[in-house]
């Protein structure tokens, strides 16, 4: 039964397609016959009146009137009358296959191709006219292609985005304010990310300032090369000898600080490079923070929440460890978290 029902539905669809093709053939033949009759009737008549002499005699009615304007106005009237009469004739014979159309609105679309064909060509609508006439002029095409060509297609227009307040309607003012708030939030997110890099930078500066007291210019000093810088600082520039006392003192300070930080989980093999990674990734603050206007930079809890919001989970544990180390050193020296 299922196969029989499928066969019947297939036969019905093929029958409907055949009826459509027969209807298109009839309309095509009628169109060609009417066009040939109109061409035969208008072939013997000259639409343009005989051209006047280039130099009319004196006192003639046509003297002083330009020829081209007169001929253009006279020639337009018969062509317009002939086009309109032929259009009405075709539209009256257009619903040739009304037995196939069940809805009362089917006759109107059938008249549209004829009117589009007979109407004078417009520069902006000739594409749509050619698309609608193509099934009538080539009835041997596939019925599926004809169906797709007859269906109206919507023009895809690019969306216009504007931010000027004068060009936006009243209802779109909220949309504009939303876009501006989003831009400001992106700027705020970038600033918060710089705070993460500033935490790593401040920790490195605290470590270097503790190991090398009295050294104001730390250009070229990093936590990773502290042992090398201890030897370089302990070497006298005059004779190249090593100041053993200074070397021993700097080494003891470095080992004592490393022992305190290792209790918090800090590793001399991992976290110096990780601090450089955070600084290069997020950057540092461009100007000195105002602690009275923004107490975020002096609150360990607020900084911890910011790090959780900004840093991805893969680097979150080590980033929080650097913050804990910075807070511990800030408690020992009594200075703010972000010391400038």
Swiss-Prot record:
Subcellular locations according to the entry: Cytoplasm
The keyword RNA-binding belongs to this UniProt entry's keyword annotation: no
Note: Highly variable expression among individuals is associated with differential sensitivity to the DNA alkylating agent N-methyl-N'-nitro-N-nitrosoguanidine (MNNG), decreased expression being associated with increased sensitivity.
Primary residence: cytoplasm
Biased composition (Basic and acidic residues): 123-133
Pfam families: Speriolin_C, Speriolin_N
Residues modified as Phosphoserine: 60, 134
Protein name in the entry: Speriolin-like protein
Domain of life: Eukaryota
The gene coding this protein: SPATC1L
Keywords noted in UniProt: Cytoplasm, Phosphoprotein
Region Disordered, annotated ranges: 42-73, 94-135
Family per similarity comment: Belongs to the speriolin family.
Parts of the chain that traverse the membrane: none
GO cellular component, one term: centrosome
GO biological process, one term: actin polymerization or depolymerization
Molecular functions (GO terms): identical protein binding; protein kinase A regulatory subunit binding
């Amino acid at each position: 039964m299922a196969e029989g029902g499928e066969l019947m539905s297939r036969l019905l669809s093929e029958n409907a397609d055949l009826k459509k093709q027969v209807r298109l053939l009839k309309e095509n033949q009628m169109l060609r016959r009417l066009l040939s009759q109109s061409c035969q009737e208008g072939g013997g008549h000259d639409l343009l009146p005989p051209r006047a002499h280039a130099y009319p005699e004196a006192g003639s009615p046509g003297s002083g009137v330009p020829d081209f304007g007169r001929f253009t106005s006279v020639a337009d009237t018969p062509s317009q009358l002939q086009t309109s009469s032929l259009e009405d004739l075709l539209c009256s014979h257009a619903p040739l296959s009304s037995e196939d159309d069940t809805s009362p609105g089917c006759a109107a679309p059938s008249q549209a191709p004829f009117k589009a064909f007979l109407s004078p060509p417009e520069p902006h609508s000739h594409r749509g006219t050619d698309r609608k006439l193509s099934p009538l002029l080539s009835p041997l095409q596939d019925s599926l292609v004809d169906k797709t060509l007859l269906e109206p297609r919507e023009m895809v227009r690019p969306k216009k985005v504007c931010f000027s307040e004068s060009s936006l309607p009243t209802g779109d003012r909220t949309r504009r304010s939303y876009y501006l708030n989003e831009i400001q939030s992106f700027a705020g997110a970038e600033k918060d990310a710089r705070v993460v890099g500033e935490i790593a930078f401040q920790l490195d500066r605290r470590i270097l300032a503790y190991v090398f007291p009295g050294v104001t210019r730390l250009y070229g000093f990093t936590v990773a090369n502290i042992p090398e810088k201890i030897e370089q600082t302990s070497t006298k520039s005059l004779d190249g000898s090593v100041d053993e006392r200074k070397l021993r003192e700097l080494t003891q300070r470095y080992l004592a600080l490393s022992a305190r930080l290792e209790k918090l989980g800090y590793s001399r093999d991992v976290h110096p490079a990780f601090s450089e990674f955070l600084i290069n990734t997020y950057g540092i603050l461009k100007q000195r923070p105002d602690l009275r206007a923004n107490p975020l930079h002096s609150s360990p809890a607020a900084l911890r929440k910011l790090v959780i919001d900004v840093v991805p989970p893969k680097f979150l544990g080590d980033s929080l460890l650097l913050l804990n180390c910075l807070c511990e050193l800030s408690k020992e020296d009594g200075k703010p978290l972000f010391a400038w």
